[in-house]
Amino acid sequence: MCAIVLAAGEGRRLRPLTAYRPKALCPVGNVPLLDRALHRVAALGFADPDTVAVNACYLGEQVVRHVGGRARLSVEPDDPLGTSGGVARLRDWIDGRGVLVGNADAYLATPDAPPGPDIAALLAGWDGRTVRLLGRPVTGPSRPGDFGRHRFAGFSLLPWSRVRGLPVTPTELVRTVWRPAEAAGELEVVEFTGTYLDTGTPADYLAANLHAAGAGSLLDPTATVTGRHRRAVVGAGAVVHGTVERAVVWPGGVVHPGEHLVDAVRVGADLTVPATPAA
């Protein structure tokens, strides 16, 4: 088996944050999302360029530089190929293996197990023929993208038989693999009962950061914080002289004296991205 972490997307809903970094490199709890994904699959045994790959496109040079030699890199030269096309472009590297596919922007956490073991049920007892999805139970009304009473939670497991014929064109796994497998009775949903956020909007991105921080604040030891903070995440080299509450200050960010940053993300000295949860 092998693993692919999908990190090519632009993250348009997360703009203007993603004007500075690709979504995969946006920090959650002061750790880039991509590093969280790589750590999770490494704990399952996918920890070198022979067993784990990362794709890149939007601001791809940042992803390439960040990954270095930790994984096989697949740089898509034009527009992102989507989740299916991105996997297809790595077909020669996959070379007959089953593949665990994870979204870099998926934030998962459970109090019952560390990253890696928390999704190990996705691999347990797999026969190499079915398609498996990690799914959160749906407690409210169903959505068109749901799978029965479950909602996709960032990771899927694909057999080689479903990968080898994928076209290297912009398209999504939900259309090329998941729904066809569901129609054929070859889709299994493995339940995940922990926290899952796709970090696709500023509000969800803030929620993931606050979850990572727990009940208090998470302050990088290199940050300078003289102001008040409550449920805040403050990155490396940041300077906080004002008040931060339910907020994220990116590495190198500045909160000036007298400022009150609340339900927002601060980038640099003057960019404030509101992240108020939807009513």
Segments predicted by a language model, with ranges:
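Active-site regions of enzymes building and remodeling cell-envelope glycoconjugates
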Residues: 69-74, 142-149, 247
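Active-site metal-binding loops of divalent metal-dependent hydrolases
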Residues: 10, 104-106, 137, 253
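Conserved beta-strand segments of alpha/beta enzyme cores
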Residues: 24, 70-72, 186-188
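Conserved catalytic-core motifs of eukaryotic protein kinase domains, centered on the activation segment
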Residues: 16-19
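Structural signal for interior beta-strand "rungs" in well-ordered beta-sheet cores
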Residues: 218-279
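A generic "binding-loop/recognition-motif" signal
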Residues: 10, 21, 59, 77, ...
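Catalytic-core segments of class I nucleotidyltransferases/pyrophosphorylases
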Residues: 98-100, 107-132, 137-213
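Conserved N-terminal catalytic core of the sugar/cofactor nucleotidyltransferase
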Residues: 1-5, 13, 27-112, 268-279
